[in-house]
């Protein structure tokens, strides 16, 4: 199945009142990028200029999960891998909607995985997207 130009994310960003332009022009971009690329506490739960800015999960990924289930015909028998899962919010929502589905998430952020939602943490692992440990079609 080809994904084409599906966009599940834009609707999440268009609902916010954040100043996206100010965020990238008000601070030293090189410093912010260097800190963000560590994918640690500063990126996830530090100042907004470095990344997420410590937002508490509010359920916003449920809309994306519902859209993906419809678009791809996912079911309780599906196997779902989220590469770059961060704190696993999307997988958390998918698992709530499809409790029988096999979900796994991988990310390069130790901090993200260690600070993911407890309900999904055991499904997440530290891996590089270029060197996944999963067999094809598994």
Each model region followed by its residue ranges:
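N-terminal auxiliary segments of SAM/dcSAM-dependent transferases
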Residues: 1-34
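Non-catalytic substrate-recognition/targeting regions of SAM-dependent transferases
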Residues: 37-41
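Class I SAM-dependent methyltransferase Rossmann-like catalytic core
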Residues: 46-60
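Conserved alpha-helix/loop element of class I SAM-dependent methyltransferases that forms part
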Residues: 58-75
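A general structural motif
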Residues: 75-77, 100
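Conserved class I S-adenosyl-L-methionine
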Residues: 77-86
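Class I SAM-dependent methyltransferase SAM/SAH-binding core
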Residues: 89-131
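A short acidic, Gly/Pro-enriched loop at the edge of an enzyme's catalytic core
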Residues: 130-138
């Amino acid at each position: 199945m080809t994904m084409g130009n599906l966009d599940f994310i834009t609707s999440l960003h268009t609902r916010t009142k954040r100043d996206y332009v100010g965020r990238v022009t008000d601070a030293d971009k090189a410093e912010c990028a260097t800190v963000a690329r560590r994918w640690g506490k500063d990126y996830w739960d530090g100042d907004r200029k470095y990344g997420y800015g410590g937002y508490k999960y509010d359920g916003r990924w449920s809309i994306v999960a519902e859209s993906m289930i419809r678009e791809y015909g996912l079911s309780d028998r599906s196997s779902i891998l989220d590469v770059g899962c961060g704190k696993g919010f999307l997988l958390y929502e998918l698992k709530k909607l499809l409790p029988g589905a096999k979900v796994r998430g991988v990310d390069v952020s130790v901090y993200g995985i260690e600070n993911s939602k407890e309900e999904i943490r055991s499904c997440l692992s530290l891996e590089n997207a270029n060197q996944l440990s999963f067999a094809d079609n598994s």
